[in-house]
Amino acid sequence: SIRTVPEFEAAQAARRRAKALAKAPESHLATVRRARKINRILGETYPYAVAELDFDNPFELLIATVLSAQTTDVRVNSVTGALFARYPDAAALASARTEEVEPYIQSLGFYRAKARSIVTLSQQLVERHNGQVPSTLEELVELAGVGRKTANVVLGNAFDVPGLTVDTHFGRLARRMGFTTADAPE
């Protein structure tokens, strides 16, 4: 269809306004509303979203989460059954030598470092927390091999404490959706 000059100019002006609005910064309230909408949609789409790691108690979840770095939950689940059968609690794992633990997790990447980490972590649980997994972020991140991500996984799944578990992929999505410009999850 042939447009008249005024129609063409009006269409051009509308495109310029739309472009300007797209570049305009989103208000804080609009960002919060958009985040809540996304959260609602995800909650409706995935109502039973749970950790894929197999665990029966906070200790098992903590150890499994430490072991999950740089590997899949499926791979971790393939080794934790035998590991927890031999070392069912912090006291048992704390008394083990690293070399004794390594064969149980050697199919995981970085298994030597992870074995050292979970033995040291278990020793710290016994010494500082009477063998129990603490239920605060501050206490968890003081343990060997436990960062904010691991702590939030444990808090959310073992103690029902809400928090954000930010990994590389979630961080990238949050930046792409404009929720943050930060590279670090803190």
Protein language model annotation of sequence segments:
Residues 23-186:
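Catalytic cores of DNA base-excision repair glycosylases
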Residues 1-27:
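Polybasic, lysine-enriched low-complexity intrinsically disordered terminal tails
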